[in-house]
């Protein structure tokens, strides 16, 4: 509109009343006569500024018309009788042609659609006219956004606000594309520069055309947002129910989410940072939890009156048989979308075609199939190099899982790689490549699937194999499947009978069928002749839990489901009869090298505190060829059940069978034991010996032992034979009868069985009166309650066997990991034996937890006194102090100390960098170049740049050992002096230290050393500086006298001798086991690393070790302690490895 026309009154209408409106360029909000707002509810309050001052006013959200065009906006009450319009509410009044960055070739897209359409010529011309008529509907620019005039969405959070997130590193190639998007959205008001307490990282995603899509990671925000109850229908359900008529159209709404406004109170949640500046969304952002549901609900509501339309997020599908009707309905859709404020992308749209692409599939009149684009992606798949690539490939394959009947079985080996992956690495083999190619070939040759006809009943055909179930869905009159379903049985389901596996598959099929039935009956065809008869399946034949059987049986009562037996599917008939069981033919015992007959028995115990007395009997026999008993055992077991006795007898026989070469037969009369050993034991072993309720099995130790024996000797056969029966062979009857007799004897003698004391040879001789070294003769030794005891002055003590002494010490020590004396006193309460203290010390030295936690009980050797350089400037010690409080832009101070004189130079720097170090030392080396520079291992001193600088000047670099400041004690001492002096001089003004550095340097260089009795200035120049308290006699000396005095001072320097070594000190040797101190141990964490080997001794106080990470490191012995076990003791570091995992 011409700007002059804006000065004229504009026709308006509100609530059916016509009035005038005036465009006000200075208005920030539209003003409505207050009489029209009496029945409205305010949505908030806002502060209004006018020439008369500021005032809080109610804000309303109303709908009115301007020049016949609908306007929805926030307004306030006005005392005038006309409307004052804010320019932001009617932007179309002054609308200029949109100018963004990248122009879309719209004409090219329209010609492409017209060339591919299947519409007759008349309708094609009508479509061409529609392109011109609705030009404002099409997307002319990339990143062009519509403007949906609806009440803004409010993004509500839960009880806790989201936490701001850091920005990820961004690929530099993505920055130009993202910058274009942000610039275009700023021009359209979709983004606004605004600071926020929230931040979401930008995550650019590459597009196929080489550009990048701007995606925001809103996962942290989504955690705090309540999920909208109304959610989108699943794409599979839409594909199964869409109308497939002759002419089909798909429309793509461009940037649909960005057309929906949000309330200003929600802006802060959407904030992100780009190029150091923060932006917020004024529209519904992509990636927000409820964006798809809110957007789809709006589009569905707009198009609800249009027949044969289906909406999935920003994709619109419609289909009709009549071309005229199709074009008429298309125009209605165009008109609705334009009035609503949406923009349509013709690049991704297909109009009036017989086959269109919708939701990733080719949609035809008969059904759906895989697109050429998808098949091309399959052919471009290469073997994955890591876990992420494998998951991406499986995600792509899973998209088409319903197109082949055995998809789950084909991809199962690939999914197994995910479970066995080590971090992000996978073990990909040639077999995996073949399997992947097999899946790709099957998908590329897959046929189209038929559409679901809602007026027909749904047919399900079910089949099963030992490892998987197969399902096909049909329309009642259909010839092609609607979809396939393949289900791989779990470990628990693999143990089911074939009938139960078929019922499991049927259950999975019916869950999916409820979505596909669309209110129609479901016809299930299976190899089961009569579903009602399966209820009579005997309990011993049921492997599944009762709850599963209850679920399966409920389908019999569902009136929507009918079960049929399909005679046309012979491959589905072969299911084992659940009423019969197959048994392997019994071999004659002469075919085995040995035969064990086992039995268990239990009687009621006469002891009221016990329930049973159990015993087991085992007979070892052979047939050469006659029956001959080689050995027999009758063993009491105590208070146990007969079942436990049966299992223990089989375990005993299996252990004895390990010593026999060749096949061995173990016969038991317990059906439970034989069936469990032959059928259930492999599953128990694989799942950790737990039952279906994930609880440990009864008698788990026995079953583990039997499983171990069977794995060590696979030719052990465990066979069930009934007890005393006329139906069993005579050669088995004899062995069973004897084993039963022995088991009964064991159960009866258990009460009078006396346990023999556990004595070794030493204690046995002691009881016989022989003199044993270490046992005093004056004490009395006797046997009581199966234990050897000694009567000592402090009381009666138990003497344990030698094999038990280590366990006793460890048990006493592990209670609280006490020291030698505390552990010894605890043991001495009950026990005594010779050399008890020595055994305690030995075991404590092997406690891994104490080794890495206790402090060292040995001191390192005396401190080495490094030789003082003979001349000034031979050796410099350098280090950084800081960070200090900012002072004129400086934060750090480089300290340089001369090794011979202690003379100090101070250089302020802004950072402890290599460049700052080199710059400062270049000033100093203009006076003299040192031979050696000693420093710690900071980054500024160990960089290649600093090493190159030193090499060019012939300077040797020397470094302190880590975590050992004593190595650079000269400069460390100066650092403490500098900090102390600065603190005292800067009380109340810590940021003024830069100006005081010359004063501090002068003070340090003229301070007397209590040891040397001279100042650094005197040691360097031979005379005092011109400062207070200076020796005035030296100021008048001639140059010859100064040099003579300087030589006298330097030759008289006091060289302290090395102090003598402590009696508790230690010296390192090559090959010695030592433990390195943890630099900064966390609370309740070990203070020492696991033992390492000394590889080289550089000097009495510095060594090279192979550290706990496998690296050679130079360390000071001040940070080491010798390991307790050195000679002949195994360096078992398993415990310490476990404890150091999280260091």
From Swiss-Prot:
GO terms for biological process: DNA integration; DNA recombination; establishment of integrated proviral latency; proteolysis; symbiont entry into host cell; viral genome integration into host DNA; viral penetration into host nucleus. The active site is at residue 24. Its cofactor is Mg(2+). The record marks 596-597, 751-752 as: Cleavage. SUPFAM superfamilies: DNA/RNA polymerases, Ribonuclease H-like. GO terms for molecular function: aspartic-type endopeptidase activity; DNA-directed DNA polymerase activity; metal ion binding; RNA binding; RNA-directed DNA polymerase activity; RNA-DNA hybrid ribonuclease activity. Its EC number is 2.7.7.49, 2.7.7.7, 3.1.26.4, 3.4.23.-. The protease is a homodimer, whose active site consists of two apposed aspartic acid residues. The aspartyl protease activity mediates proteolytic cleavages of Gag and Pol polyproteins. The reverse transcriptase (RT) activity converts the viral RNA genome into dsDNA in the cytoplasm, shortly after virus entry into the cell (early reverse transcription) or after proviral DNA transcription (late reverse transcription). RT consists of a DNA polymerase activity that can copy either DNA or RNA templates, and a ribonuclease H (RNase H) activity that cleaves the RNA strand of RNA-DNA heteroduplexes in a partially processive 3' to 5' endonucleasic mode. Integrase catalyzes viral DNA integration into the host chromosome, by performing a series of DNA cutting and joining reactions. This enzyme activity takes place after virion entry into a cell and reverse transcription of the RNA genome in dsDNA. The first step in the integration process is 3' processing. This step requires a complex comprising at least the viral genome, matrix protein, and integrase. This complex is called the pre-integration complex (PIC). The integrase protein removes 2 nucleotides from the 3' end of the viral DNA right (U5) end, leaving the left (U3) intact. Residues 1117-1134 have a biased composition (Polar residues). The gene is pol. Mg(2+) 2 binds at residues 599, 646, 669, 740. Specific enzymatic cleavages in vivo by viral protease yield mature proteins. The protease is not cleaved off from Pol. Since cleavage efficiency is not optimal for all sites, long and active p65Pro-RT, p87Pro-RT-RNaseH and even some Pr125Pol are detected in infected cells. Residues 590-748 form the RNase H type-1 domain. The reverse transcriptase is an error-prone enzyme that lacks a proof-reading function. High mutations rate is a direct consequence of this characteristic. RT also displays frequent template switching leading to high recombination rate. Recombination mostly occurs between homologous regions of the two copackaged RNA genomes. If these two RNA molecules derive from different viral strains, reverse transcription will give rise to highly recombinated proviral DNAs. The keyword Protease applies. Mg(2+) 3 binds at residues 874, 936. This is Pro-Pol polyprotein. InterPro entries: DNA/RNA_pol_sf, Integrase_cat-core, Integrase_H2C2, Peptidase_aspartic_dom_sf, Retrovirus_Pol_polyprotein, Rev_trsase/Diguanyl_cyclase, RNaseH-like_sf, RNaseH_domain. Residues 1-143 form the Peptidase A9 domain. It catalyses: Endonucleolytic cleavage to 5'-phosphomonoester; DNA(n) + a 2'-deoxyribonucleoside 5'-triphosphate = DNA(n+1) + diphosphate. Residues 198-363 form the Reverse transcriptase domain. The keyword Chloroplast does not apply. The reverse transcriptase/ribonuclease H (RT) is structured in five subdomains: finger, palm, thumb, connection and RNase H. Within the palm subdomain, the 'primer grip' region is thought to be involved in the positioning of the primer terminus for accommodating the incoming nucleotide. The RNase H domain stabilizes the association of RT with primer-template. Integrase core domain contains the D-x(n)-D-x(35)-E motif, named for the phylogenetically conserved glutamic acid and aspartic acid residues and the invariant 35 amino acid spacing between the second and third acidic residues. Each acidic residue of the D,D(35)E motif is independently essential for the 3'-processing and strand transfer activities of purified integrase protein. Residues 1117-1143 are annotated as: Disordered. Keywords: Aspartyl protease, DNA integration, DNA recombination, DNA-directed DNA polymerase, Endonuclease, Host cytoplasm, Host nucleus, Hydrolase, Magnesium, Metal-binding, Multifunctional enzyme, Nuclease, Nucleotidyltransferase, Protease, RNA-binding, RNA-directed DNA polymerase, Transferase, Viral genome integration, Viral penetration into host nucleus, Virion, Virus entry into host cell. GO terms for cellular component: host cell; host cell cytoplasm; host cell nucleus; virion component.
